[in-house]
Amino acid sequence: MMKIYRACIMLSGESAAGKYPVEAVRTMAEIAEYTERHNDYESNFRNTKFHGKDNLDKISHAVCSMALDVDAKAVVVCSVSGKTAMLVSRFRTPVDIVGMTTDPKIWRRLSMSWGVTPVLAEEYPNMEVMMYFAKKQAQEALNLEKGSNVIITGGPVSRGGGNTNTIKIETV
């Protein structure tokens, strides 16, 4: 069973040098797609005991819990380092995640995180402006309908990475 929560799958031997590389890739894709379709991510999240390591871990868990509680259609993570977006991603909630960052390197890294739509954003002068554009980016990136709830999380823009301390519920 493929329930180990990985964002990526890699085939090395058979796909690179084996006799049946196309079949190997096709089979792995079918298994992964089947597993994704038949996994109840919300139940898994709600029924798993959570033990947070630090405040960032706890905030990431709270974001996911809040997204489910308010029936949010998206979570937007404003992240300099990408760490918060990756932590939110690991909880596998059935809510789309937009990972906003100003760093092209982090933007590329977020594309490998489960359920994350990475968005390369400009730097914003303050948190209020960042939150405004976060909601707008989610609406554009995910084609959200008017009235949809969005959870936005981030931290002070002047401090750099690792300072996520805010969670906000917005309505598109």
Predicted segments with their positions:
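Short, solvent-exposed amphipathic alpha-helical segments in soluble enzyme
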Residues: 26-29, 87-95, 112-116, 137, ...
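Generic secondary-structure signature for well-ordered alpha-helical cores
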Residues: 3, 7-8, 29-41, 68-72, ...
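Glycine-rich phosphate-binding active-site loops on the catalytic face of alpha/beta enzymes
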Residues: 2-21
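Nucleotide-binding motor/catalytic cores of P-loop/tubulin-like NTPases across gene-expression machines
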Residues: 84-86, 92-129
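Long, charged amphipathic helices and adjacent flexible linkers at domain junctions
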Residues: 27-64
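Conserved, mostly hydrophobic/aromatic
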Residues: 1, 88, 150
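C-terminal helical cap(s) of enzyme catalytic domains, especially alpha/beta-barrels
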Residues: 15-37, 167-169
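C-terminal binding/interaction regions
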Residues: 131, 136-153, 157, 164-170
